[in-house]
């Protein structure tokens, strides 16, 4: 976990080393306000080297500053034995408390120094490891593996809040799984936006309007707040084909064929030709439907009238009241009977 401490950590002096140090290195190692603290202690591995190769070797931290102008490293008894100039005091970027495990704190370089590439190798803290284990003999050379820092986004938050580091890979995995991830806002990554589900019926539909049917108030421009309200809550739009057409319009007459009675003084109009034929029989007196019951001589101009009449002979009453046990041979008689139940 990354922790950012705005207050410089108290520094403790280490064993002095009598080596001169360039002035430009002192400027580059000034304490910075922000630093990265790696709380996990580094694995300390010590190996015993031959006494012939360890005489004259000086244990010093490795400097990785880009614009360092120090002297080139001098070759020692082995390829790994290198000498680098070190500071007389403890480095400002390294803090080593005596009562806690070693913590390596890295301070970013000054603005004039070119930033390092990623991944980078952190310099091993050899003097801190020696002082921790109580090793003072120059014959033992501690070998500490360098730490490789993976590219993760740094999120600088206030020192009063709990620091949080979110990796890009973890965030992508969480987004694919559908689980919500709490993320603190930072200056280096944009705000996360939630996906909004849009219903298909919310979008306003395009409708063709007839200019002769539109009233003048509808043509007035709508103010922006009203337009936004109409966009969020669209009104019900009736399609032109579903609108009830006027009675006297030519479209209505074309769609609904009107059958008029051609007798003088009769203004009866029917939508079906069969109804017009039955009506014309009232003028002519024709009654083609005759009752077939034995001894019955009744005739009717309409077939439905003959059907109702024939039920008198058979006694069939197909229309039964749901509120009582009475039955009727005609539907209009049943409707009249049910009205009586409603009044009572």
UniProtKB/Swiss-Prot annotation:
CTBP-binding motif, short sequence motif: residues: 61-65
Keywords in alphabetical order: Activator, DNA-binding, Isopeptide bond, Metal-binding, Nucleus, Phosphoprotein, Repeat, Repressor, Transcription, Transcription regulation, Ubl conjugation, Zinc, Zinc-finger
Crosslink feature (Glycyl lysine isopeptide (Lys-Gly) (interchain with G-Cter in SUMO2)) location: 68, 195, 197
SUPFAM superfamilies: beta-beta-alpha zinc fingers
Transmembrane segments: none
Tissue: In 8.5 day embryos, expressed in midbrain, anterior hindbrain and ventral forebrain. In 9 day embryos, expressed throughout ventral anterior half of embryo including midbrain-hindbrain junction, ventral midbrain, diencephalon and forebrain. At 10.5 days, distribution is more widespread with expression also found in developing limb buds. Widely expressed in the adult.
Pfam families: zf-C2H2 (PF00096)
Region (Disordered) residue spans: 66-111, 235-254
GO molecular function, a single term: DNA binding
Family that this chain belongs to: Belongs to the krueppel C2H2-type zinc-finger protein family.
Descriptive protein name: Krueppel-like factor 3
